[in-house]
Amino acid sequence: PSTFIISTPNGTDIEEQYPVAEREYKIQRVEGVPQKTVKPPAEQLQRIRSDSALVVKARKEVTSVTDFLEGFIKPIDGPVTGVYGSQRFYNGVPKSPHYGVDYAAPKGANVIAPAAGVVRLAHRDLFYSGGTLIIDHGHGLSSSFLHLSDILVSEGSRVERGDSIALVGSTGRSTGPHLDWRMNWRNVRVDPELVLETLPAQ
């Protein structure tokens, strides 16, 4: 087991031990990706850095809001076509692991908020992720939705669980319409499917 120090909202720290199991990750080979998103030209590097700074800023604020405690539902119904942690090869080129869950869905399909929160980023065209939406669920836990064709909410607005927030697309580094749902707790990646399994959604 590993030992963790947990800081509670009232300022006290709790030391707990939890078993941590090994996990095997798949390898996914994706062909037909726009080549400019596999090996970006030099003139795009500044844009990529600027995009990254926007995402970091959107995830930076840590509030005392506890929207995440109501639990999470799937943001869309559809088969899972990409899993968290899989090693990705794009057009045969090895890249970073995939830190989200991909759901196959037609372009224009409705995406709903998996939990309540505040919209921290609503950008229609980031280089890698295309139409991108980030929702803050409180205490540094956030959801990101990538490759969107349209965004239905604005930055600073509050959404409730089940609200329509965006439409599925194939923008950015993508080969076809799908939703890429990602989660972060501060600067730590989180598998969204684990949150679905562990937090109450009823």
Q: How would you describe each model-predicted region?
A:
Residues 3-90:
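Polar/charged, compositionally biased leader and regulatory segments
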Residues 73-202:
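Catalytic cores of peptidoglycan-degrading enzymes
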Residues 1-2, 177:
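A short, compositionally biased
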